[in-house]
Curated annotation (Swiss-Prot):
GO biological process: asparagine biosynthetic process; L-asparagine biosynthetic process
Active site residues according to the UniProt entry: C2 (for gatase activity)
Entry annotated with the keyword Repeat: no
GO cellular component, one term: cytosol
Important for beta-aspartyl-AMP intermediate formation (site feature) positions: D380
CDD domains the UniProt entry points to: Asn_synthase_B_C, AsnB
Boundaries of every Glutamine amidotransferase type-2 domain copy: 2-229
Top enzyme class: ligase
Signal peptide segment: none
Name of the featured protein: Putative asparagine synthetase [glutamine-hydrolyzing] 2
Organism: Methanocaldococcus jannaschii (strain ATCC 43067 / DSM 2661 / JAL-1 / JCM 10045 / NBRC 100440)
Length: 515
């Protein structure tokens, strides 16, 4: 949707050309407009930059950086007038419930943007304003009167936020390339060893790590408060997954699930530009398209898909859905030459090691979609919410096995079978299940990979810490914990959501996730 940049520096002024370089580095995220704000105080200097992809209120009133003069109750959206503002924001994302928030808090607004709602709600509620938001966001607010910087990232980390801090400079951007435009950290001695080890174990680098030292990702559901007078940074989680008990009443599950899904799709279709949908042929994206028919004419809806040569092609399933819903469908077959064309571009797109090869077809389908629409709905997150991965099923099986007497599990863990023996693979898996049932549930991931080469200590520490949190939230059931683990830490935030953010921003449109 957009891109944000900024520099906070002590002892030396930020110059406009630096922010201009950062904006240029991520211009692909926002081709419609850009803005810069520079502020020099007695002991610090601030520069903020923004590149815009217009979705809501396409007029100049959506320009950023955007400011708010509290005494005059006036929104300022011209760069040359921002000195009059008390609060200035650069923001990437969308607050879906901004209209409801305007009504709830009696906010008088001058623009049709959700950016203005964030500014005025921050002025009214302070840092707790994010607790009211239903949406995806990464933003930085400069509060002149309080002398602080307030940064925040949405609950699941849909929108990215990278920052560099060395005690003298705080530099942030929507992508690492924004930071690299003004800071020479792309050197061998700056490579973060822990991040490299986590990458080889996970296939991505999880928050708060980045590939470089002193450079971090703001974590999902996290606020960062920077006291500029004290040079102190404080981070905290503004949201925790509520404690809950699983619902086993099928009727109640269907009723609540349907209501939540319909509400999610409806509110994400708010837009002043054309909306389409990805369609993979799977349950998640097909369900989203099915729900969309309640709020739009599907005969005018553009849907997009990718096919492959060979056994992994799901084109027949896609065709079934398209024939049923009668959408305006666009299909592309991903070929070997597409891979060859993109391979050299891959490292530039993702800035740091990223091992999900599905990023290649995601880029191609995004490129195709941009010819027809500006906003695309997808089915990402469905497996994490509904327990759709085999690891989740294995976790539920493990919960059952743990109910067996311990002596039986000990005997089972010593079955004289090996992994490479033909014909008894299921016996080996059963032996492994018995073995894993004897360890603490929080060590499930740390112990399920035996090869030390791809199970470094930092990986063990990271998975144990995250699974412990998930077990506490999941009624101490491993199946529930593994689902929460994927939702909050593993498959979504720094993996799948990174993939779709980079692909969509590079091809200039906004992607919405629903589950």
């Amino acid at each position: 949707m957009c891109g944000i940049n900024g520099i906070i520096r002590f002892g030396k002024e930020v110059i406009k050309e630096e922010i201009n370089k950062m904006n240029k580095a991520i211009k692909h995220r926002g081709p419609d407009d850009e803005g810069i704000f520079i502020y020099n105080f007695k002991n610090y200097s601030i520069g903020l930059g923004h590149v815009r992809l217009a979705i809501l209120d396409l007029s100049e009133k959506g320009h950023q950086p955007m400011g708010y003069n509290v005494d005059e109750d006036k929104i300022i959206y011209r760069d040359d007038e921002l000195d009059r503002a008390d609060i200035i924001i650069v923001y990437n994302g969308e607050i879906y419930n901004y209209l409801e928030l305007k009504e709830k808090f009696n906010l008088e607004t001058e623009t049709g943007t959700d950016t203005e709602v964030i500014l005025k709600l921050y002025n009214k509620l302070g840092f707790d304003c994010v607790k009211e938001f239903n949406g995806m966001w990464a933003f930085c607010i400069f509060d002149k009167k309080k002398g602080l910087i307030f940064c925040s990232r949405d609950r699941l980390g849909v929108k990215p936020f990278y920052y560099y801090w060395d005690g003298n400079e705080f530099i942030f951007s929507s992508e690492l390339k924004g930071i690299l435009a003004v800071k020479e950290i792309n050197k061998k001695e700056n490579i973060n060893k822990d991040a490299v080890e986590l990458y080889f174990a996970l296939g991505f680098i999880p928050s708060p790590y980045s590939i470089y030292k002193n450079t971090f990702k703001l974590e999902a559901r996290q606020n960062l408060i920077f006291d500029l007078d004290k040079r102190e940074i404080r981070k905290y989680y503004y949201w925790e997954l509520p404690d809950y008990k699983p619902i086993y009443d099928k009727k109640k599950l269907i009723e609540e699930g349907k209501k939540l899904l319909y509400d999610a799709v409806k509110i994400r279709m708010r837009s002043d530009v054309p909306v389409g949908a990805f369609l993979s042929g799977g349950l998640d994206s097909s369900t989203v398209v099915g729900v969309m028919r309640e709020f739009t004419d599907l005969s005018k809806l553009h849907t997009f898909s990718i096919g492959f040569e060979g056994k992994y092609d799901e084109t027949p399933y896609i065709k079934i859905v398209v024939d049923y819903f009668k959408t305006q469908h666009h299909h592309y077959y991903f070929k070997e030459r597409d891979f060859e064309e993109l391979i050299d571009k891959y490292s530039w797109i993702y800035d740091e090691p990223f091992g999900d090869y599905s990023g290649f077809p995601t880029y191609k389908v995004s490129e195709m979609a941009r010819k027809f629409v500006t906003v695309v709905l997808s089915g990402d997150g469905g497996d994490e919410v509904f327990g759709g991965y085999m690891t989740h099923l294995n976790g539920y099986r493990m919960d059952f096995i743990r109910k067996l007497p311990k002596f039986l599990r000990v005997v089972g863990s010593k079955l004289p079978v090996k992994k490479d023996l033909n014909g008894i693979a299921n016996l080996y898996l059963l032996k492994e299940a018995f073995r894993l049932s004897l360890i603490n549930p929080e060590e499930f991931y740390a112990e399920s990979i035996k090869e030390d080469a791809i199970r470094p200590e930092i990986y063990k520490k990271w998975t144990i810490e995250k699974l412990r949190y998930c077990l506490n939230k999941g009624d101490n059931k491993l199946g529930e914990a593994l689902r929460i683990f994927d939702l909050l830490f593993n498959t979504l935030c720094d993996n799948f959501l990174v993939k779709v953010d980079r692909a969509s921003m590079l091809t200039l449109w906004k992607l919405e996730v629903h589950f």
